[in-house]
């Protein structure tokens, strides 16, 4: 459709192809961090439901360490397997190089920032800190991801690399804010039903 024509004019076919392949690989890489989200919800929710903020604090730390470890190992494995995954696609060398860069950018930050911006934020929500996490996520998506995507991807002509950088900047900012929020203990003041 018209949107596809517009995207091809903005980024070019090889960038669109690389982005499509990279996103398929990203979905595999994201599994470790995403899988830990419900663990945070269950464990932190149980602790807070029992009125045991100290246990919740303990499990926040423990689950965050576990998530970082699992995410790091899994993202490294997926990155190392990327050349194998690309064999399933008919890609030009230029496109393959771009896929490698996109997966590298994603996986480094998926291992380092997403455990805080994703899984840890689920724990905050389970503790009743729902509005804060929602506002931060919405504002960060608009102010960081959208604006940086436009600035880096289109204005500075970085293409899909710029958009990937905008995405990981969004994760990184959320990670810092949610880590600070968890450390502040403010989440302990909410009533969980």
Protein language model features and the residues they cover:
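Short, small-residue-biased leader/transition segments that mark boundaries at the very start
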Residues: 1-6
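Small-residue-rich hydrophobic transmembrane alpha-helices
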Residues: 19-82, 114-138
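Short alpha-helical transmembrane segments in multi-pass integral membrane proteins
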Residues: 44-110, 153-193
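Helix-loop interface residues and adjacent transmembrane-helix termini in multi-pass membrane transporters
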Residues: 10-13, 50, 126-128, 157
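Short runs within selected transmembrane alpha-helices of multi-pass transporters and secretion channels
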Residues: 34-37, 106-126, 132-142, 148, ...
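Alpha-helical transmembrane segments of polytopic integral membrane proteins
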Residues: 82-83, 145, 149
């Amino acid at each position: 459709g018209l949107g596809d024509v517009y995207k091809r004019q903005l980024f070019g076919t090889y960038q669109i192809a690389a982005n499509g392949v990279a996103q398929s690989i990203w979905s595999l890489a994201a599994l470790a961090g995403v899988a830990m989200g419900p663990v945070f919800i269950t464990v932190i929710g149980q602790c807070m439901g029992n009125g045991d903020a100290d246990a919740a604090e303990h499990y926040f730390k423990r689950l965050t360490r576990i998530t970082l470890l699992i995410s790091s190992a899994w993202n490294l494995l997926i990155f190392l397997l990327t050349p194998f995954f690309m064999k399933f696609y008919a890609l030009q060398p230029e496109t393959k190089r771009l896929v490698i860069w996109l997966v590298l950018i994603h996986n480094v930050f998926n291992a380092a920032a997403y455990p805080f911006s994703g899984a840890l934020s689920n724990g905050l929500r389970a503790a009743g800190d729902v509005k804060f996490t929602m506002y931060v996520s919405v504002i960060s998506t608009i102010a960081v991801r959208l604006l940086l995507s436009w600035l880096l991807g289109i204005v500075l002509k970085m293409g899909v690399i710029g958009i990937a950088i905008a995405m990981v900047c969004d994760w990184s900012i959320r990670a810092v804010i949610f880590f600070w929020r968890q450390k502040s203990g403010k989440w302990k003041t909410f009533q969980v039903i």
